[in-house]
Design a protein with these regions (language model features):
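Cytoplasmic helix-loop-helix junction between adjacent transmembrane helices
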Residues: 166-207
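C-terminal transmembrane bundle of multi-pass solute transporters/carriers
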Residues: 3, 38, 96, 108-112, ...
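Flexible cytoplasmic inter-helical loops of multi-pass small-molecule transporters
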Residues: 41-44, 244-268, 480-490
């Protein structure tokens, strides 16, 4: 359900020798890539000379601190744009298009971003991402100053979409940085500590989400979009300046002589995924879940804004996002255990039950409590998926695999977001206000302003619950569990 609120991805070693081979349990060299029976997924081999230790962990913590500033900035402006767009246009369709467009661009750019990450130093990729985001936000500021308010808020005109579009692009480029950060966890953190490192990243993202949820709503309600843009530009510049002072111990990725790497290396990503039995099925399962998750993405804010003022809704999101911090702290403290795939499935069961019950009646504390629980379990799911990929996929191909997985999984959300917006706006919401709608479904969803949206949430939760039950009894689930255990590095590493 990572795509549900675009809670962007959590961040996910064995010691590599000069020949890029690890030692076995008895100190003997492991089979090389060309040896019979060799399987690339038996360890996420690092480049020669890179050994996780105190220095690399310090670099990881510095990157993590910078991620906090960057995530605060991007989330702050993106949340503010969503609130501003709905309040000014009063259109569920407009907010659905914005959310769907964001996820669509993330999906289209995933493979390209992943290829860039694998073929360049991770620090350089992060710097480029932050710089592009800064330029986009500055362009949005220029548009805000150039055009009058009545043209900016007319969602039927080009100015509104140009203004929202450049902010959207600035947020999309952040996913390039997130893919790079996922691979730096593999690079900088020893294998046995990666699940806890992913929990730390979840904690940081939860803190960022909590801060921005509160201040985005307050900023739009009290300061307006102009000051909000100015603050976002300043924070982005601050994050970029800090990032330039960080050093990541890494080497330039090797390149084939005379060969130009493809911009979209789909073949390399698919090859790495096929090398791990069951991994493709996990990605397809996440894709289906995100198809259902697009409903949450499209309708969670409109439903919340029917129960709360924009200022109150921002505070509710800020308070409930503390659950995201708690979930990340739990993983950082206790890890995921020996079977992260099982943890991932159980979390999806909880998410499905939340979708069924948290809008069953139009009661603010039920909705807020459901969001709080949702925030608690999402970091566990994110950390589980990241930890699995970081162990079973070779480091040299992780960027492409993360990017490909992002593209495939996230591509489902815009489909449902684009579909459910018009269906809710012009179909279910008006229908549930009629006597016929109340007579047919009133026993289930009760009475209120947004019973049509509640009906969509309930149906989506039931669909997800069935999908998880089927997945947990399927052969690919058992195969991938074995693949993860077989990929465990020997104790000597």
């Amino acid at each position: 359900m990572s795509a549900t609120t675009d809670l962007t991805t959590d961040l996910s070693v064995t010691t590599a020798s000069v020949s890029a081979m690890t030692e076995g349990p008895e100190g003997s060299p492991a089979d090389g890539p060309d040896a019979p029976g060799h399987s690339e997924h038996h360890a996420a081999r690092l480049p020669p000379g890179i050994t996780p230790g105190p220095q690399t962990l310090r670099a990881f913590r510095a990157v993590l601190a910078n991620t906090l500033v960057a995530n605060v900035t991007t989330s702050y402006l993106w949340f503010a744009l969503t609130f501003w767009a709905y309040l000014e246009t009063k259109s569920v369709l407009a907010t659905s298009i914005l959310g769907g467009s964001y996820m669509l661009l993330i999906a289209v750019g995933g493979i390209f971003f992943g290829t860039l990450v694998d073929h360049h130093r991770k620090h350089a990729v992060m710097v480029a991402s932050s710089a592009i985001t800064l330029v986009m936000f500055m362009l949005a500021g220029a548009l805000y100053l150039l055009f009058p308010t009545q043209r900016l808020v007319d969602w039927n005109g080009p100015v509104f979409w140009a203004f929202a579009g450049v902010i959207l692009l600035g947020g999309v480029v952040e996913s390039l940085r997130n893919i790079a950060l996922s691979t730096t966890v593999t690079l900088l953190v020893p294998d046995g500590q990666r699940d806890k490192a992913n929990g730390q990243v979840g904690t940081v993202q939860g803190i960022a989400f909590m801060i921005t949820s509160v201040f985005s709503g307050l900023s739009i309600g009290l300061l307006g979009m102009g000051w909000t843009l100015g603050l976002a530009i300043g924070l982005t510049a601050l994050a970029l300046g800090h990032l330039l002072t960080i050093t990541i111990p890494e080497q330039r990725p090797p390149r084939d002589e005379g060969a130009r790497p493809p911009a979209f290396d789909i073949r390399g990503a698919i090859g790495a995924i096929r090398a791990v039995p069951g991994l493709g099925a996990l990605i397809l399962f996440s894709c289906f879940n995100n198809l259902v998750g697009g409903v949450y993405m499209a309708l969670m804010d409109p439903y919340g804004l029917t129960l709360f003022s924009v200022e109150s809704w921002g505070i509710v999101l800020g308070v409930t996002s503390f659950g995201f911090v708690l979930g990340g702290l739990w993983v950082a403290r206790f890890g995921l255990g020996e079977k992260p795939l099982r943890s991932l499935m159980l979390v999806n069961v909880v998410v499905a039950l939340i979708g069924i019950f948290f809008t069953v009646r139009e009661v603010w504390w039920v909705y807020a409590g459901g969001i709080l629980l949702f925030m608690c379990v999402i970091p566990i799911a994110e950390a589980a998926e990241q930890t699995i990929l970081q162990r079973v996929v070779p480091f040299a191909k992780q960027g492409r695999v993360f990017g490909f997985a992002q593209s495939v999984e996230v591509a489902a959300s815009p489909v449902s977001a684009f579909l459910i917006g018009p269906i809710a706006q012009y179909g279910l919401i008006p229908y549930m206000k009629t006597a016929e709608g109340q007579e047919r479904f009133g026993w289930l969803v009760g009475a209120g302003q947004a019973r049509g949206i509640a009906l969509v949430f309930i149906a989506s939760g039931l669909l997800m619950l069935v999908a998880v039950a089927v997945a947990m009894i399927s052969p690919p689930y058992r195969v991938l569990s074995r693949s993860y255990q077989q990929a465990e590095p020997p104790p000597a590493s």
